């Protein structure tokens, strides 16, 4: 269907106005600032109004990395319901209004690319007038290609060598990187990320390749000993990209003991009850250092998830977030800025649903032996890789290390000639 032009150029005055707008230098701002300036959300029953960065504060730093010349790639690991795909919409808004350059979004298949174009891109144009007015609106526009008055083009594709090995494009975005293994080996030519990155190489530090996804591959070696605090268990897909990057994780700072910690599903606590609703509705999070209680909602008398997210920080592997706000330590360096957000901190997910789905899946496994529901909730809701039951063991290195007890320093009595030590395994 042919779109009507968004602008009228029937008069000399209109032509002059449009030419002046095209020649005007872009206003200097970050992607997150552009999102608040230009992006409108119209989701009746959920939220209607301008984009607000404090709704998903953990997206600000990854969004602003997209225009950094320090990195050529970004990997974002996160659960569903965290808003990670909105980063692309905000990047597009920034590009259209401030810094035009061709972009391509690669979905898991042709049908999902078409759906993304209709549900995401077209809605962005309709709901955000300042973005929609930049469409050329000619007959050349179609569901897979969008042209803008600045001359930039947005293309939507899917994992195939033909799509991923064409002309150079400075800005590439791969969504749902782990879904169905579609990007693991594209037509025998290599990973989707490597093929996409090859398209941006021409632009060197001004090119950017992004992959985002919740984890989708199983941990194959649960006994692997992690070498750094932020390293992920080795799996293919998005977590492999994360490990190649500078490995940032989202931290909260305890309001009581002031120690930073990563909000993780393992820190949630609930009553010991056969009633799953009772368990999930009373779930709270406890600080791993001092047991301070945190609640999901505000108004409970305990610090809430929203309050903690607003004060949260991304911490690179090798760094330590000090009480005065400074980062100490030597951060891991890489051309890939990589982020890993867990489901407990996701804005649009609730702790009661996380707990209910997990306990329901555990109960299903106990009664049927099926791990499908458990794997799904661990991957997509909790945002972590799944370890199959047959591979999990209480003798895993992390489990044994966690059991260690500090007996302190003892004094050897005078006259002792030697000491022995024995370990029972």
Language-model features: locations:
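Phosphate/NTP-binding elements of NTP-utilizing enzymes
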Residues: 2-297, 304-423
């Amino acid at each position: 269907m042919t779109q009507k032009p968004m602008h009228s150029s029937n008069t000399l005055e209109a032509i002059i106005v449009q030419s002046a707008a095209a020649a005007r230098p872009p206003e200097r701002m970050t992607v997150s600032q552009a999102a608040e300036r230009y992006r409108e959300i119209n989701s009746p029953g959920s939220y209607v109004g301008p984009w607000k960065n404090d709704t998903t504060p953990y997206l600000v730093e990854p969004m602003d990395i997209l225009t950094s010349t320090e990195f050529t790639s970004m990997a974002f690991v996160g659960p569903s319901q965290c808003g990670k795909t909105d980063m692309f919409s905000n990047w597009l808004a920034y590009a259209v209004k401030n810094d035009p350059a061709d972009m391509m979004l690669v979905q898991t298949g042709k049908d999902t690319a078409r759906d993304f174009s209709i549900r995401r891109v077209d809605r962005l144009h309709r709901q955000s007038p300042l973005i929609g007015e930049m469409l050329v609106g000619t007959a050349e526009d179609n569901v897979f290609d969008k042209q803008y008055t600045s001359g930039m083009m947005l293309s939507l594709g899917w994992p195939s060598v033909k799509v991923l090995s064409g002309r150079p494009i400075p800005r590439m975005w791969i969504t749902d990187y782990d879904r169905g293994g579609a990007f693991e080996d594209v037509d025998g030519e290599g990973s989707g990320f490597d093929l996409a990155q090859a398209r941006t190489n021409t632009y060197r530090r001004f090119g950017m390749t992004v992959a985002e996804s919740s984890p989708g591959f199983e941990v194959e070696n649960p006994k692997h000993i992690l070498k750094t605090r932020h390293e992920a268990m080795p799996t293919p897909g998005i977590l492999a990209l994360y490990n190649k990057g500078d490995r940032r994780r989202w931290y909260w700072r305890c309001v009581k003991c002031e120690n930073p910690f990563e909000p993780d599903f393992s820190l949630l606590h609930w009553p010991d009850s056969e009633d799953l609703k009772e368990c999930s509705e009373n779930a709270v999070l406890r600080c791993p250092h001092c047991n301070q209680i945190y609640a999901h909602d505000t108004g409970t008398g305990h610090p809430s998830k929203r309050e903690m997210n607003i004060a949260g920080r991304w911490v690179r592997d090798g760094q330590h977030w000090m009480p005065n706000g400074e980062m100490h330590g030597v951060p891991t360096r890489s051309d890939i800025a990589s982020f890993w957000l867990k489901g407990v901190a996701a804005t649009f997910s609730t702790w009661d649903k996380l707990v209910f789905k997990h306990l329901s899946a555990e109960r299903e496994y106990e009664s049927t032996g099926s791990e499908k529901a458990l794997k799904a909730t661990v991957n997509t809701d909790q945002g972590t890789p799944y370890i199959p039951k047959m591979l999990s063991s209480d003798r895993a290195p992390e489990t044994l290390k966690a059991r260690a007890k500090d007996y302190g320093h003892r004094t050897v009595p005078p006259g002792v000639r030697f000491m022995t030590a024995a370990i029972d395994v």
